[in-house]
């Protein structure tokens, strides 16, 4: 492991256009569960399968049940950026890392100080009225009734990409552009099981594609 860490450090030192592509495993030390591990979100008991709840059809059919799940499982009180988030932000400040492409919706990369973050699946910290488009923060909707509603009467929806919904085109294009231009692509905290997001690494054209464990990343 020491040899792998030293090689990773060496490549980082030699690179000046690094992109990090990450998933839920990056945030587990912050107390946020991943999805597919033994203790992950998809293996926890709930009234409906999480994959069903996290779908556009279910949100429209039963927003009250969706928000019960959202408040209890997706919004984790007290979650703070961990050493991995902070290290990536540091690499950006050093001029090494040009972008973070994340499948996470927890906003921890931004809170750690990273500026150029592409949140493929959105963020729980952005919420909009489905009727008039008014913006609401995560704190706003947590203080509302079970189904948050706008002053206009419309249902407020988190800016989270649910099953049956497409990725934001601008976010997707930005992520692809950075991955294509990268001289080093670090992949961590993801099983690469969710498409189309997982397919983005196929756009990498360099020869330094580095899958890392959490231990490597925080070193």
Q: Where are the regions that the model predicts?
A:
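Conserved catalytic core of sirtuin-type NAD+-dependent deacylases
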Residues: 1-218
């Amino acid at each position: 492991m020491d040899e792998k860490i030293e090689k990773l450090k060496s490549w980082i030192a030699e690179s000046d256009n690094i992109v990090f592509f990450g998933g839920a495993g990056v945030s587990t030390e912050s107390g946020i569960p991943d999805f597919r591990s033994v203790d992950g979100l998809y293996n926890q008991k709930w009234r409906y399968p999480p994959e069903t709840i996290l779908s556009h059809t279910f949100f429209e059919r039963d927003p009250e049940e969706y928000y019960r799940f959202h408040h209890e499982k997706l919004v984790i009180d007290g979650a703070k950026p961990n050493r991995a988030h902070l290290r990536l932000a540091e690499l950006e400040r050093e001029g090494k890392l040009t972008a973070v492409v994340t499948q996470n919706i927890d906003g921890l990369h931004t809170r750690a100080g990273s500026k150029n973050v592409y949140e493929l699946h959105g963020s729980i910290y952005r919420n909009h009225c489905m009727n008039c488009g008014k913006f609401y923060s995560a704190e706003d909707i947590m203080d509302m009734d079970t189904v948050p509603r706008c002053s206009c009467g419309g249902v407020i929806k988190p800016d989270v990409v649910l099953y049956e919904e497409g990725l934001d085109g601008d976010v997707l294009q930005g992520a692809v552009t950075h991955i294509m231009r990268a001289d080093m692509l670090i992949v961590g905290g993801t099983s690469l099981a969710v498409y189309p997001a997982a397919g983005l690494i196929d756009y990498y054209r360099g020869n330094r594609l580095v899958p890392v464990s959490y231990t490597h990343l925080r070193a």
